[in-house]
Structures are given as C-alpha cells and as structure tokens.
C-alpha cells in the first residue's frame, strides 16, 4: 500500500506502561481545521492506524465462525506477520500488541463481551418513550446516563487492579463510543472511539497479541450488534452522513476488516455482495456481508440508489483491492476529516504529541 504518511511502529516499551505512569483524562485537542496537522503527526494517529491495520492482517481469510483456542494463535499470528511483508497491505504502520509470557487465553476478551452484554441488557430495560418525533427517541438519554454513571465501574471489571489508575482514562473512550446523547446520533467518530478504547487496552497490556482475532470477531462484532440495536431501538440519526454518497450511515471498520476476511475466498467475489442469496447464505461468516444485510433491512428501494458507493465497490475485481481501497478511503473520509476528528480525545495512551522517531 503506497501511503505517503507511513509512521514507524511505536516503541514496544510503551506498550505495557508501569502502574506509576501518569494517566490523564483525555480531552479534545483538535479545535480548528489547521489543528488537523497535529493529529496527522501525532503518536495517537500512528498508534490508532497501526492498530487498525494489525487487526486487518489478523483476520485475513478467516470466518467469524472460525474455531480457535487463543493459545493456538501465537505461531499463526507471527506467520501472518512474515507473510504481510510480501502482501500489498504493508505492516509498516502496524502497532505491535504486547506479548505475554505465556499463551493462556485472555480473560479480558470474555470480560469485554460481558461488558457489552450489560449495555445490551440496559437497552431492554430502557424502552423507547412515546414522542411526536419519529427519530432520536429521548429514552436514549436515559440509557446513556446509565453508561455515563457506570462506565468506570464497567471498565474496572476488565482492567486488573494493578492498572486501576488507567480506568478513568480508558473509560472516556467507552463513553464516547456509543453515540451523542444531545443529538441522539451515531457515526464513524463514535466507532473510532471504540477502536481507540480497544487500542488503549492493548497499550496497557490488558489485551495481547494472542487476542488479535478475538478482538475483532468476539468483541468488536458484539459491539456492532449492540450499536445496531441502539440505532434501531432509539431511531438514532446518522452523525455526519453523506447520504447515498457515503459508504454507510453508521459504520466503516467492519467493511475494512470484513473485506480482509474475504481475501482469496474460493468463490465469493465483490460482485456477490449485491446478490441477496449470497448475502443470506454467508452473512454469519463475514462482517462485510452482515453489514450489507443490515443495510437492506433498514433501507428500501434499489441498492444502487440507497447505497451508491457500495454498489460501485461491487465492481472492483478482487477483495484485496477492495480492502486496500477502503483503507485509503477510511483515512481520507474519516481520519482526515475535521468534523470527525474534532471530537477525538487525547490522553497519555493516545497522545497528541508528535510521533517519536527511532
């Protein structure tokens, strides 16, 4: 991938900070369009995009129903990293996830799924209210207030006690990841906050390289399910939607990782994702197709009209090219757009300072 802004991977010594590190409450740093230069040069940008690309490599060619024991993934991940150097998507930007001294399964994965299950249960406990407006049900604010109050307690169930000082910093990204309670909307900036939340857990050593596939297939996929339930239950508005010219009203990352899953698939090609039969038969295995199914459930009319950008992508000859193109598009349309990044928050784990060299 010929990207001009490649950054060197962060020093691995930063990946498992000592308990004495000064954690801080993340805050906004991008206040004007010229500030975007600080973001592009920041350690936060380098670590964030590296994290996204690392997971992109990890899920390549694998189904959501992939049966694995975390302890068996150690050698596989390192074999994939060797292969990645020969592939079109470079790992030069990849962030090295912290290595464990052993290959025992990570309890953090199951704890994160339990956390998301709690958010799901709260939706059931907070039904929509009757109101004149069709969109933006105000019951969402009640649901969000519960998360705002309990976020640190939830994160504390995932983070070990010796890293308890990190909880307030990490919890901010969780609260930012579920939508805006004032506007009752959700978009790719909120999705990015959840990826940042997971990235922070990796940087403090709660999640490890062994967890790479499970981060996407178990945790992020469960997050998607909860977000879709939020969107449907409370009729949330898309944040910053580009309408038919955008990729999707709400998500972007599952299209990237989902297209990576489909690279070198024996028979499913990009042209098949606009085929209703192919989607219905394979959506449980592939995030990309699950996204397409959700779109067709939520929108009416010809696919080419309500999702023109995706319709155009279906003409791309291979999934590897789709994947490369989506990564470039994500950078250009999400990470380099002021309306999205102005809401991103920076702390000690994802700092605004320029990327360190050497």
UniProtKB/Swiss-Prot annotation:
Biological process annotations from GO: mitotic spindle organization; positive regulation of apoptotic process
Region (Disordered): 1-20
Residues with N-acetylalanine modification: 2
Keyword rRNA-binding: no
A Gene Ontology cellular-component term: ATPase complex
Its EC number(s): 5.2.1.8
Keyword hit for Coiled coil: no
Gene3D superfamilies membership: 1.20.120.1150
Top EC category: isomerase
Single annotated GO MF: phosphatase binding
Domain of life: Eukaryota
Binding site for ATP: 183, 188-189, 339, 342-343
Disease named in the record: Parkinson disease 25, autosomal recessive early-onset, with impaired intellectual development: An autosomal recessive, early-onset form of Parkinson disease, a complex neurodegenerative disorder characterized by bradykinesia, resting tremor, muscular rigidity and postural instability, as well as by a clinically significant response to treatment with levodopa. The pathology involves the loss of dopaminergic neurons in the substantia nigra and the presence of Lewy bodies (intraneuronal accumulations of aggregated proteins), in surviving neurons in various areas of the brain.
Subunit structure: Associates with PP2A heterodimeric core enzyme PP2A(D), composed of a 36 kDa catalytic subunit (subunit C) and a 65 kDa constant regulatory subunit (PR65 or subunit A). Interacts with the catalytic subunit PPP2CA (via C-terminus). Interacts with PPP2CB.
Name this polypeptide is given: Serine/threonine-protein phosphatase 2A activator
Organism name: Homo sapiens
């Amino acid at each position: 991938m010929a990207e001009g802004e490649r950054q060197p991977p962060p020093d691995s010594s930063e990946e498992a900070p000592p308990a004495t590190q000064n954690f801080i409450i993340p805050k906004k740093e991008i206040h004007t369009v010229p500030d975007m230069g600080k973001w592009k040069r920041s350690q936060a940008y380098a670590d964030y995009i590296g994290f996204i690309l690392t997971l992109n490599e990890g899920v390549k060619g694998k189904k959501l129903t992939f049966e694995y024991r975390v302890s068996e993934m150690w050698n596989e991940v390192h074999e994939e990293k060797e292969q990645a150097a020969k592939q079109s998507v470079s790992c030069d930007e990849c962030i090295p996830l912290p290595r464990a001294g052993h290959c025992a399964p990570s309890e953090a994965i199951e704890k994160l799924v339990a956390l998301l299950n709690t958010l799901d249960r709260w939706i059931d406990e907070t039904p929509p209210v009757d109101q004149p407006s069709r969109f933006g049900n105000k019951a969402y604010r009640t649901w969000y207030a519960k998360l705002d109050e309990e976020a640190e307690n939830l994160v504390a169930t995932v983070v070990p006690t010796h890293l308890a000082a990190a909880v307030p910093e990490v919890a901010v990204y969780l609260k930012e990841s579920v939508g805006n309670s004032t506007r009752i909307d959700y978009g790719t900036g909120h999705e990015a906050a959840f990826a940042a939340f997971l990235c922070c857990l990796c940087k403090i050593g709660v999640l490890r390289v062994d967890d790479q596939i499970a981060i996407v297939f178990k945790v992020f996929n469960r997050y998607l399910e909860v977000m879709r339930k939020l969107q449907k239950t409370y009729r949330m508005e898309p944040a910053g939607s580009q309408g038919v010219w955008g990729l999707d009203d709400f998500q972007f990352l599952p299209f990237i990782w989902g297209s990576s899953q489909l690279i070198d698939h024996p028979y499913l090609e990009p042209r098949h994702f606009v085929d209703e039969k192919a989607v219905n038969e394979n959506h449980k295995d592939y995030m990309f197709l699950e996204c397409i199914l959700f779109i067709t459930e939520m929108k009416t009319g010809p696919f080419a009209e309500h999702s023109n950008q995706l319709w155009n992508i279906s003409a791309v000859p291979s999934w590897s090219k789709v994947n490369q193109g989506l990564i470039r598009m994500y950078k250009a349309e999400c990470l380099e757009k002021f309306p999205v990044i102005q809401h991103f928050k920076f702390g000690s784990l994802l700092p605004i300072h320029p990327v360190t060299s050497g």
